[in-house]
Amino acid sequence: MARRSEGKKKRKILTDRGVVHIKSTFNNTVITLSDADGATILWSSGGTAGFEGTRKGTPYAAQLAADKIAKEALRLGIKRVDVLVKGPGPGREAAIRTLQAAGLEVDSIKDVTPIPFNGCRPKKKRRV
């Protein structure tokens, strides 16, 4: 007898709150929507928005990725989000503005960019 393969089970989202993680680098912007525990619900990036190469790092690519996340979040019933921003890229502000404009209520914006407390020695000319 053939075994039935079990696919991924979609979890029902029971809350109207979520956390949006925006990781913005100079090459790309990755936006992830998770629940309060940190479990990923959905994600999008400059690449999944249809951009390739250096255009993935543009604010416009981040805007399209954030719009996709916001529309899907509203469809799932998530209305209020906390935003955690990481990285120095150009897509940070564009993504936050798009989330607000799309109808999500942004409760807080927090910068969680990792900064070393005198960690590893920078290479060559990068020493300041």
Swiss-Prot record:
PROSITE patterns, per database record: RIBOSOMAL_S11
GO cellular component, one term: ribonucleoprotein complex
Domain of life the protein comes from: Bacteria
InterPro entries according to UniProt: Ribosomal_uS11, Ribosomal_uS11_bac-type, Ribosomal_uS11_CS, Ribosomal_uS11_sf
Gene3D superfamilies found in the cross-reference section: Ribosomal protein S11 (3.30.420.80)
GO molecular function, one term: structural constituent of ribosome
Pfam family, one: Ribosomal_S11
Transmembrane feature ranges: none
Keyword RNA-binding applies: yes
Biological processes per GO annotation: translation
Keyword tags: Ribonucleoprotein, Ribosomal protein, RNA-binding, rRNA-binding
Coiled-coil region(s): none
Self-association and partners: Part of the 30S ribosomal subunit. Interacts with proteins S7 and S18. Binds to IF-3.
Family: Belongs to the universal ribosomal protein uS11 family.
Described purpose of this protein according to its UniProt entry: Located on the platform of the 30S subunit, it bridges several disparate RNA helices of the 16S rRNA. Forms part of the Shine-Dalgarno cleft in the 70S ribosome.
Protein name: Small ribosomal subunit protein uS11
